[in-house]
């Protein structure tokens, strides 16, 4: 990770560029220049990659697709499209096909993906660019990875087989087996382009990869967040914020916490499919505490409670403070506490240490 000093240095450089651009715009009477937070973060990443002389850079899109900040980079060796769900609908479209069409616009050369609905694969195979206001279609070289086979797992990770070989990952959820399989397939395509990646590096990378706030079983809550986890209790962080992500969380609850009492501490942004998320998760909870995420786009806890309470089989309450809500849930009568619904929840935990 970058040091605080490096982040400050790169942010300062980006700010100076933004200010210079605004001066020019003011001189010519052009509209105000307002880059988004993600655009600024992408610029910071580009400076870091250049400054650190990285050989290979992996860029993850924001909302993904044609208008994504990362699409400013033309020199792409490989593009990867993970399972597509209904998210960012206001910007990308209301169907899987429409969303896939926008996401596919960012791809270049070889595209690695997994088994997806036919309408999605069709769009990935036939992306288009917009030039002079017209659509120009092109053919993409699409590689679909093979299906993984789950072998065994616990709260520390999973073992699966892919193409006849066993691999281990530390992340939870059957969907991560698909993501890992895409990564293995992508490495195979990079090798065809003469990238030297040996099997040991691949296996080590898969095993050591962690993704905070994605079905994360929290081990060091006291040190990081000043939260105490009682003995025999489990704390999980999950930032999934659409029905697709809620389904993966629901499946994990059924797989990993069968016959356990579950307390959800839930906060969701109002521009998400709140009812869809709640319909999937609420019936699995013995208790739910509604909170308001730290965002101007947040759904207020009172409104969320009105939606989720009829779906919950147990008590549904509200709490003002996120950390207090989590600690109270851990101290209660449920075995598993899951803080979920939005990635914004976890930044609040860190800032309120």
Language-model features, listed with the residues they occupy:
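Nucleotide phosphate-binding/pyrophosphate-handling subdomain across enzymes
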Residues: 56-61, 67-80, 84-87, 163-287
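Conserved catalytic-core segment of NTP-binding enzymes
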Residues: 63-67, 73-131, 274
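C-terminal helical cap/extension that packs against the catalytic core
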Residues: 117-140, 155-157, 231-237, 278-336
